[in-house]
Amino acid sequence: MQVKNRLTPFFENITFDREDNEMILNFGPQHPSAHGQLRLMLHLQQEMIVKAHPDIGYLHRGMEKMAENMIYNEFMPTTDRMDYIASSANNYGFALAVERLIGLEVPRRAKVIRMMLLEINRLMSHLFWLATTALDIGAMTVFLFAFREREYLMDIMEGYCGARLTHAAIRIGGVPLDIQDTFITQLKTFLDKLPQNIKDYEDLLDTNRIWLMRMEEVGVISKEMALSWGCSGPMLRASGVAWDIRKEEPYELYDEVEFRVPYSDKGDNFARYRIYMEEMRESAKILYQTIDMYEKCVKDNQTELMAHAPKYISAPKLDIMTQNYSLMQHFVLVTQGMRPPVGEVYVATESPKGELGFYINSQGGPYPYRLKLRAPSFWHTGILTDILPGHYIPDVVSIIGTTNIVFGEVDR
C-alpha cells in the first residue's frame, strides 16, 4: 500500500508590489546587526532606500497569555526574558503594578535598594548599547572598553542576587535580600572611575570620521514624528521632548534625588548617542545619592525589606519557621497565590529604553484576567518605516543601533 504524504509543501509564485528599477532586499532575520530576530524588507533604487517594512514575530513566546495562567509571583522570572539586557527594570515594572493594584507600601530601605538596582541596570544597558553600536560601525576598541566596565557591574549584581543577566532581584512588596558591605565598596569604586571612562569613550568616538559620518544628520526624527509613533526614553528626548517618567511621575524615591534630564532638538543618531552618554553620568549621580540614603537607613535602624501584608506577602523566613500561622499563610500563597481585589491598573516606569508599562486587569482570582505589556522597543521598531527611506544601506545598521531595540520585548 502506497502512503501519500498529505503534508507535501505547496509552492506558489510570490509577487512583490514594486516599481520599475526597484530591488527588494531582505535585511535579516539572521543579520548580525539586526539586534535580534528582525527582518527588514527594503525597497531599493540603486542603493537608496525608498520603502522599509519591519517584519517581526520571530521571537514570539506569548508572554501576555502565559501571565493569564500563572499566579502573580510565578510570572516574575518571565519578565526577565523581555528586555533581557535590563531585566531588573522589567521585574520592577511588574512588581510596582501589582503593588499599586493591591495598595501596598514598600519599606524605605527596600525602595533605596530597588533604586540602586534600577540605576545599575540602566548603566549596564547603556554600556551594552554603546559597545554593540560601536562594534557595528567598526569602533572595536570602544566595544572592548564598554564591555569591560559592564562586566564589573555584572559581577556586582552577581554578588547580590547570584545572577548576571536575568536577575529576578525584585519581589512584589520589596526585595528579598539586603546588600552587603562589599556591594557598596565595589559600586563606589566603579562610580569613581566612570566619568573618566565616559570621557575616554567620547574621545575615541568623537574624533572617528566613520562614526561621525554614520551619526551626524543620519536617522533624523522630528519632534512630531517621535510623538506620533509613541517614542519614549532617549529616542524621544533626542527629538526635543524632555520627558522622563522619573521626573514627571516619580516613583520610589526619585523625587528625593537630584538629577538632570538631558535632551536635544537635533533628532539624529548623534543626538541619541549624546543622550546615552549624558544619562550614564546622571545615573552615577543618582547612585551616589542612593548610597547616602542607604547609609542613613542603616543609621536610623530601618531594617525592613518586605512590606507587611499577610494576605498578599509571605512573612519573614524566621516567622515561617517558628510560627504555625505564618507557615500556613506562606503555604497558601505559594500553592494558590495571592488574590488581588477586582480592578485594573496601568503603571509606567522609565526603563533604559523608554516607557515600560504594565496593564493588569484583576477579577479577584489568583491569576491576572488580562495582562498587557507596553514595551518601548515595539514602537521604536515601527518608526523604522519612516526613518529609513532616503538613506543608504550602510546607514541602516547605525539607525537600528541608535533605536536600541531588543526583540525579547518587541515580540514578547
Swiss-Prot record:
The reaction(s) this protein catalyses: a quinone + NADH + 5 H(+)(in) = a quinol + NAD(+) + 4 H(+)(out)
EC identifiers of the protein: 7.1.1.-
Keyword terms of this UniProt record: Cell inner membrane, Cell membrane, Membrane, NAD, Quinone, Translocase, Transport, Ubiquinone
Subcellular locations according to the entry: Cell inner membrane
An example Gene Ontology molecular-function term: quinone binding
Membrane topology label: Peripheral membrane protein
GO cellular component: plasma membrane
One Pfam family per UniProt: Complex1_49kDa
Top-level taxon of origin: Bacteria
Family in the record: Belongs to the complex I 49 kDa subunit family.
HAMAP family hit by this protein: NDH1_NuoD
Subunit structure: NDH-1 is composed of 14 different subunits. Subunits NuoB, C, D, E, F, and G constitute the peripheral sector of the complex.
PANTHER family: NADH DEHYDROGENASE [UBIQUINONE] IRON-SULFUR PROTEIN 2, MITOCHONDRIAL, NADH-UBIQUINONE OXIDOREDUCTASE 49 KDA SUBUNIT
Chain's role: NDH-1 shuttles electrons from NADH, via FMN and iron-sulfur (Fe-S) centers, to quinones in the respiratory chain. The immediate electron acceptor for the enzyme in this species is believed to be ubiquinone. Couples the redox reaction to proton translocation (for every two electrons transferred, four hydrogen ions are translocated across the cytoplasmic membrane), and thus conserves the redox energy in a proton gradient.
UniProt name for this protein: NADH-quinone oxidoreductase subunit D
Organism: Sulfurimonas denitrificans (strain ATCC 33889 / DSM 1251)
Gene: nuoD
